């Protein structure tokens, strides 16, 4: 999930916290661990316009962490209501991210979530808290 977490970087995951919008989470998908940002919470409506702007329940979501505001591949029908017990996640590099916009990944269940990614510990020149 670039630009926040790059390939080969090592991060710390805090287990046991309920994900909130904007949190970066690690979750299991197809015997792999993916890192994405929580966008939609259970029961919310998520919509993405042709310019890549994200709306939650009709309100434009402020995403200062995004540099690549693109729709990317989207195989779900928008607007999309997040099912109970699941979270809608997007990668920060929207044009290439495999995330909840894909029916292959879909919304992430609470059981899939390892925890919140809070700290990058490798490489040493990029050590620090993630936002």
Describe each PLM feature range:
Residues 2-131:
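Soluble "head" domains of membrane/secretory-pathway proteins
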């Amino acid at each position: 999930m670039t630009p926040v977490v790059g390939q080969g970087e090592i991060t710390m995951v805090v287990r046991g916290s309920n994900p909130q919008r904007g949190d970066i989470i690690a979750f299991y998908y197809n015997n792999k661990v993916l890192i994405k940002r929580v966008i939609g919470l259970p029961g919310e409506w998520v919509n993405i316009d042709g310019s890549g702007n994200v709306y939650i329940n009709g309100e434009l979501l402020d995403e200062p962490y995004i540099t690549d505001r693109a729709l990317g591949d989207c195989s779900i029908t928008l607007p999309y209501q997040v099912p109970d017990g699941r979270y809608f996640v997007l990668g920060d590099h929207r044009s290439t991210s495999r995330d909840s916009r894909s029916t292959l990944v879909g919304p992430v269940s609470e059981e899939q979530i390892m925890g919140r990614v809070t700290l990058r510990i490798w490489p040493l020149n990029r050590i620090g808290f993630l936002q």
